[in-house]
């Protein structure tokens, strides 16, 4: 509640514990901060948007839901948008678990197409090793972020291989081959002349 009594009146500051001992002598500053509200919370310390954002970040179920929604969008979109959705969902859930879920979902979606299964298996194995290392040993945050970045780069390469550059190169070459194999303008002119004689 915004209009909490403790937001503007600290009971413990005027509490007399007996024998002249005040509250500040009973509790350290860290102990007070652990159970007393932050100063300025009721006087505009957080506005509605900041409080909503703070609640979303602190609740794991909401973070998982947002990541799941963005993962579904990533599976059903093209390469660049899929990569953006993957990076956004990596803010809310661990990157290795996200990569494993994306690779499995993409393989189930494109089950008959087995051209890029090797990269997918490599990504899932690297993600599983990363999960094992982070759960069994103490890895620094910097090293873990570096592993996450490497996994995301490999995933970006995988997504571009499936959706992006291969199709963009193959489509113009087919059109060019069709144009080259078609009848020339001289052949069209000769065909018109032969029909005009009749």
From Swiss-Prot:
UniProt site positions, description: Cleavage: 18-19, 182-183
Virion surface side: 1-55, 167-198
Residues bearing PTM Phosphotyrosine: 198
Transmembrane segments: 56-76, 146-166
Subcellular locations according to the entry: Virion membrane
Membrane topology designation: Multi-pass membrane protein
Keywords recorded for this protein, A-Z: Disulfide bond, Membrane, Phosphoprotein, Transmembrane, Transmembrane helix, Viral envelope protein, Virion
Family: Belongs to the chordopoxvirinae A17 family.
Protein name per UniProt: Virion membrane protein A17 precursor homolog
